[in-house]
C-alpha cells in the first residue's frame, strides 16, 4: 500500500515496515482477533485483546464514563503506555483493529497505527509467525479524552438537519433501509448518507489509495468542509470509516459509539426508512 496521497499516512504501517521494527524495543503490537485465531499463531511478541462484544448502548454521561473506564483499563493491562507506539491488527484492515485505534485516539494516544492488510498480509508475505506467547506487562496508563472524536446520541440529535454536518451510515443496505432490523426499530438516522464500510478496502483487505477514497466520498457529498459523524450498529464499522476519513485528512470526524443499537432502541428519537434504489 503506497503512503503517497494520504494526509495522515502515519495511521497505517505496512507489513514490511513493521517487520523491520518488531521486537522488545519496538512498538507494542496488539492482536484484536478472536482468541482461537490468536492461539493458532500471531505476530512475534504480540499481546492479545479481544474487545469484540464490549459495546455500549447508552451514551448518557454515567454509563459512558463507566464503559470508557473499562476499555481504558483493559488497554493498560495489555501494556499500553503514552510513551510507546502501539500497532493494532486483526485479520485484515478490519473493524476490530480500527475500533481499537479509534479508542486509543479517543484516549489521546498520539502514536497508534493499524497494520494495513492485517495478519493476512503478514502471512501472505511469509513473515515470521510466533506460537510462543508473551505475557503482557500492565501499566498505570490513563488517557486524556478527546471529546471531539466521540459522538453521543445528544451530539447526533443536535446536528440533525445541519448542512455543515454529514452523518454517514456505514451499515449494510438492508440495515439502512430497515429491512434488517437489529434494534427495537429498523431504519436510519434522518438525513444520513449511506456507504457501507467495506467500500474503504481493496480486494486484498487493505485500505484503498487516498485518491480513490477521496473520490468515493466526494461523490456522496462527504467532504472535508463538513463535520462527519459515522455510525453503524455499535461503533465498530463506524470506527472503520472514521479511520478512512482520518487517512485522507478530514479534520472533524466523530464516531457515534452507541450507534443504531442505542438510537433504534430509543423510541423518543426520530428515524427514517429510506427507499431502496430501484433495480430496473
Language-model-detected regions and their locations in the chain:
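Cysteine-dependent PTP/DSP-like catalytic domain, specifically the C-terminal lobe
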Residues: 254-280
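Thiolate-centered catalytic microenvironments shared by cysteine-dependent enzyme domains
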Residues: 2-9, 59-159, 180, 237-259
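Short beta-strand/turn micro-motifs composed of small residues
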Residues: 31, 90, 116, 171, ...
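C-terminal soluble interaction/assembly domains
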Residues: 225-230, 236, 248, 253, ...
Amino acid at each position: 500500500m503506497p503512503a503517497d496521497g494520504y494526509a495522515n499516512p502515519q495511521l497505517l504501517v505496512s507489513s514490511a515496515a513493521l517487520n523491520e521494527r518488531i521486537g522488545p524495543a519496538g512498538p507494542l503490537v496488539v492482536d484484536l482477533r478472536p482468541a482461537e485465531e490468536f492461539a493458532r499463531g500471531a505476530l512475534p511478541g504480540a499481546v492479545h485483546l479481544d474487545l469484540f462484544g464490549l459495546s455500549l448502548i447508552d451514551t448518557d454521561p454515567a454509563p459512558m464514563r463507566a464503559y470508557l473506564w473499562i476499555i481504558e483499563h483493559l488497554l493498560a493491562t495489555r501494556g499500553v503506555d503514552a510513551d510507546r507506539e502501539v500497532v493494532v491488527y486483526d485479520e485484515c484492515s478490519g473493524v476490530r483493529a480500527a475500533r481499537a485505534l479509534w479508542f486509543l485516539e479517543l484516549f489521546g494516544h498520539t502514536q497508534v497505527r493499524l497494520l494495513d492488510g492485517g495478519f493476512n498480509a503478514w502471512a501472505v508475505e511469509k513473515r515470521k509467525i510466533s506460537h510462543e506467547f508473551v505475557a503482557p506487562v500492565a501499566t498505570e496508563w490513563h488517557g486524556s479524552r478527546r471529546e471531539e472524536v466521540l459522538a453521543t446520541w445528544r451530539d447526533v440529535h443536535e446536528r440533525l438537519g445541519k448542512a455543515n454536518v454529514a452523518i454517514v451510515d456505514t451499515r449494510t443496505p438492508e440495515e439502512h433501509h430497515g429491512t434488517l432490523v437489529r434494534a427495537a426499530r429498523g431504519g436510519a438516522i434522518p438525513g444520513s448518507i449511506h456507504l457501507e464500510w467495506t467500500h474503504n478496502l481493496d480486494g486484498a483487505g487493505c485500505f484503498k489509495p487516498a485518491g480513490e477514497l477521496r473520490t468515493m466520498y466526494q461523490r456522496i457529498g462527504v467532504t472535508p468542509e463538513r463535520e462527519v459523524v459515522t455510525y453503524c450498529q455499535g461503533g465498530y464499522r463506524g470506527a472503520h470509516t472514521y479511520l478512512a476519513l482520518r487517512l485522507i485528512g478530514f479534520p472533524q470526524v466523530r464516531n457515534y459509539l452507541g450507534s443504531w443499537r442505542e438510537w433504534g432502541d430509543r423510541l423518543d428519537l426520530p428515524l427514517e426508512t429510506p427507499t431502496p434504489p430501484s433495480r430496473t
